[in-house]
């Protein structure tokens, strides 16, 4: 693909393909540090990060070890987290310190989270005292808290300042963030009392007091709030940024919409992977790491599959006498499993977005029950017609129809009951639900189909 980026007021056309990766690989092999450095300087940081991600492990190591090659902090922060962890192993302590000193605090925290404790302390001790204090304080909070994603760099001014004082302060202060959409107004105790959009400051006369143009209805986020909860607040209230406060309600940081986009993306990816039982697996993870991560859920799935086989074993003699039962069994189980997974996916989504509540839970149960009946009847009719044409057996058609309706109803009900029950037990429903739902639909499907078959034929 061809990427066109605007960098420092000039457009850079960057052809990203296998051929270019081959060129970079060859230049690394030939120790051509000049070509590599110049090429990376011309690229957008995201494109340079893509190049590093597409290199194999040996080439990445050789790239970092090239003479005079210094990885740009803006490039490093764009690199995939699992690749970051690998690249960090090849970087010197001075290089890591240089990267951390040139990034905003929230990006620095993400990097430090991927460094083991011993090296982390060594790196922190090499940072300026102010930076070290800020990062240590953020790291003291839980991993998924607002403190871990907030920026310590923010713009806050007293309420009694004029617009002119504020503009002069913004021009002269070098410690402010490079970009900001809102200015936080604080009282004498440094507690946030309002916000003013930066655009409004530019349009207001210099003599006007900031407290006269501030918006008092601003959102304050507790420093220990779960980051997923923060994401919901940003979604619900269409926030561009929000201040973060400590237990004394004093301003300690801010969270911006780009931080939340990353959080929501990561949470969505985690939910999809957990639903499949692979956790937070990355494409760059090694074979052993991936195998270990998948083993637990595959083992659990094996035991649940054995349960379904035990149910089938109870009807072994019936199956031997009516072979058609064995032929049609997978249809009922498969339809129930798919229907259950559909309901499960919707339920996990509504749990994650707080749409499913105690007030509408009963309503959703009735809705899924109704959907199960309707889909059950529709597919019962279709299945009955197919079986009648296939085996010319009315009894067999009736058996599959009844079991289809039963299993579709069960699938709908347990597709919502299982994740909600797990959530109430403080178990992540995205991780464990799929195994239980598929097991229930398989067992009920086989039990109903073979049980009804045994009743009618014997």
Describe each region flagged by the PLM.
Residues 263, 268-405, 409-413, 417-431, ...:
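Alpha-helical transmembrane segments and their membrane-interface boundaries
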Residues 443-444:
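Active-site His/Glu-centered metal-binding helix of metallohydrolases
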Residues 2-276:
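Hydrophobic packing positions in regular secondary-structure scaffolds
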């Amino acid at each position: 693909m061809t990427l066109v980026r605007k960098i420092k007021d000039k457009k850079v056309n960057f052809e990203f393909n296998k051929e270019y990766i081959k060129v970079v690989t060859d230049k690394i092999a030939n120790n051509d540090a000049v070509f590599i450095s110049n090429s990376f300087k011309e690229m957008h940081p995201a494109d340079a990060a893509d190049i590093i991600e597409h290199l194999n492990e040996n080439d990445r190591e050789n790239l970092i070890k090239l003479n005079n090659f210094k990885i740009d902090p803006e490039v490093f922060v764009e690199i995939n987290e699992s690749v970051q962890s690998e690249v960090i192993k090849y970087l010197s302590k001075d290089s890591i310190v240089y990267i951390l000193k040139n990034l905003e605090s929230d990006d620095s925290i993400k990097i430090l989270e991927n460094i083991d404790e011993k090296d982390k302390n060594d790196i922190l001790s090499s940072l300026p005292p102010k930076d070290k204090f800020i990062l240590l304080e953020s790291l003291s909070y839980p991993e998924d808290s607002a403190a871990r994603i907030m920026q310590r760099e923010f713009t806050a001014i007293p309420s009694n300042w004029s617009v002119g004082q504020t503009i002069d302060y913004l021009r002269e202060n070098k410690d402010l963030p490079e970009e900001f959409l809102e200015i936080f107004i604080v009282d004498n105790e440094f507690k946030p009392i309002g916000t003013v959009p930066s655009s409004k400051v530019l349009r207001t006369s210099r003599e006007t007091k900031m407290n006269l143009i501030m918006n008092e209805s601003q959102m304050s986020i507790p420093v220990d709030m779960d980051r997923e909860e923060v994401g919901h607040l940003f979604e619900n209230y269409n926030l561009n940024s929000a201040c973060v406060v400590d237990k004394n309600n004093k301003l300690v940081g801010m969270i911006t919409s780009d931080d939340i986009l990353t959080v929501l993306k990561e949470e969505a990816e985690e939910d999809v992977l957990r639903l499949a039982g692979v956790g937070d697996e990355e494409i760059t993870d090694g074979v052993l790491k991936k195998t270990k991560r998948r083993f637990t859920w595959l083992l659990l799935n094996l035991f649940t599959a054995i349960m379904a086989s035990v149910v089938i074993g109870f009807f072994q003699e019936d199956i031997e006498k009516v072979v058609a039962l064995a032929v049609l069994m997978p249809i009922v189980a498969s339809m129930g499993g798919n229907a259950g997974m559909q309901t499960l996916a919707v339920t996990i989504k509504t749990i994650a977005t707080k749409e499913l509540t105690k007030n509408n839970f009963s309503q959703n149960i009735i809705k899924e029950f109704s959907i199960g009946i309707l889909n059950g009847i529709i597919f019962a009719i279709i299945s009955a017609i197919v079986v009648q044409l296939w085996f010319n057996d009315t009894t067999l058609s009736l058996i599959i129809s009844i079991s289809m309706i039963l299993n579709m109803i069960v699938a709908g009900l347990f597709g919502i009951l299982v994740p909600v029950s797990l959530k109430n037990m403080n178990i992540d429903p995205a991780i464990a639900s799929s195994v239980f739902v598929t097991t229930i639909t398989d067992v009920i499907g086989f039990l109903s189909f073979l049980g009804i078959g045994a009743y009618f034929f014997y």
